[in-house]
Amino acid sequence: MGKVVSVILAGGKGKRMGAEVSKQFIEINGKPIIYYTLKAFEECKDIDEIILVLPKDEIDYFKREIEPRFDFKISKIIEGGKERQDSVYNALNSIGDCDIVLIHDGARAFVSNKIIEDGIKYSREFGAAAPGVMPKDTIKVKNLEGFSVDTPNRASLVAVQTPQCFKYNLIKKGHNKVKNEKIQVTDDTMIVELLGEKVYLFEGDYKNIKVTTPEDLILAEHFVK
């Protein structure tokens, strides 16, 4: 089996939290959110290397205030870009020989070992895979005037989570394409779809939340008790 690399994107600001520090550094039960995220990947036996992506102005803070407190097994810290896709591009360019790459939101601190292992398995089989859950609410499509125009079948909808998992050569090819053609994307599965490739969607977990709002933080505090 080839090498498996996880890329942890920790570039989120804490504006919606009303916090002075970036959301990945907000503490839950005495430990920053990024601690729980990194530990989840460190504890997976199939992960060979962890790359952490941080904004340029937060790398020194992490090295000074966070890293000395914990025994992280980070292979390297990469400077993020202006947009999420730029940060992923920078990380991919820092990887040498690699078979599978997992791209994960640093604020998703409660990803399970099963999701990580399933992502590796399915990306090896299909080339690209991502976890997801069925939306709990009915989803509506509205027009520019604000009126509902359609109600998609909820059974066919998936709220996609991370880690999004790929064969390295495939996602690298996709990122080169969107970089060269200046295409804006919202996640990495979209990049693979732009290549005309399919993404296998497997079962995620409602606990695998992205901690973004104060309400999410309350739920996160419950998870770590």
Swiss-Prot record:
GO biological process, one term: isopentenyl diphosphate biosynthetic process, methylerythritol 4-phosphate pathway
Catalysis performed (reactions): 2-C-methyl-D-erythritol 4-phosphate + CTP + H(+) = 4-CDP-2-C-methyl-D-erythritol + diphosphate
Sorted UniProt keywords: Isoprene biosynthesis, Nucleotidyltransferase, Transferase
PROSITE patterns for this protein: ISPD (PS01295)
GO molecular function: 2-C-methyl-D-erythritol 4-phosphate cytidylyltransferase activity
EC number: 2.7.7.60
Site (Positions MEP for the nucleophilic attack): R154, K210
Site residues (Transition state stabilizer), renumbered to this chain: R16, K23
Superkingdom of source: Bacteria
Recorded metabolic or biological pathway in which this protein acts: Isoprenoid biosynthesis; isopentenyl diphosphate biosynthesis via DXP pathway; isopentenyl diphosphate from 1-deoxy-D-xylulose 5-phosphate: step 2/6
HAMAP family according to UniProt: IspD
Protein family: Belongs to the IspD/TarI cytidylyltransferase family. IspD subfamily.
PANTHER family, alphabetized: 2-C-METHYL-D-ERYTHRITOL 4-PHOSPHATE CYTIDYLYLTRANSFERASE, CHLOROPLASTIC
Protein name: 2-C-methyl-D-erythritol 4-phosphate cytidylyltransferase
